[in-house]
Amino acid sequence: MFMKRLAIALIILLALAVAGAYYFNQYWIHRYDAMIARQASIYRLDPDLVWSVIYEETYFSPWKKGSKGEVGLMQVTPAVGREWAAETGMRDLARQMERDPQAVLRDPEKNIQIGCWYLEKLYEEFRDLPGVEARMIAGYNAGPSRAVEWNQTEAGAEPLSIEQFVARIDIPSTRAYVTSILERYRKLKLQRGGATTATQNRNATTGAGR
């Protein structure tokens, strides 16, 4: 009888542990959803794409620091943060970025804001091309100039498909990064019954960008 009760207790504890792990994971990956939605709306981006980028960059760890000085949820560099502050005319934040960029970039909402601003700049670079998401993501990871290089075609040629563009990425880590985000983004949109589109409400006049 004792062993039977012990087995039942262990099963219950195991079930509680599994349920707890599941709900904690759901909390962890969705606790910034409101911030993502708010900033994505300002910069007229699809929040699911922004979410997918953050998932890949840091798995929602706001304190993560990259090997090249990237900081926070979207792994923003101080240089990009200073560019954002200068272009948006936020003098107080520009001064803060000069004094202590780490403090600004560790703030989850500021980090998401700057990351969305940068993604919108990349959207504007490639907006007329099919599969703009792939170009945006590649530029976010490897820099806009490399994304432009990979996107080049002969004069008069058809624009590259997503598959053709990804195949041209000659940095393995960037190719894996782009592929992973696109697949996660696609699955997320399928779960929600929507189409993959990098931006939302592009005819709106809200937002700021390059």
Name the predicted role of every residue range.
Residues L16-W63, S67, A85, E109-I112, ...:
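Export/targeting segments at the very N-terminus of extracytoplasmic proteins
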Residues Y22-N25, R38-Q39, P62-V71, M97-E109, ...:
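Second-shell loop/turn segments in exported
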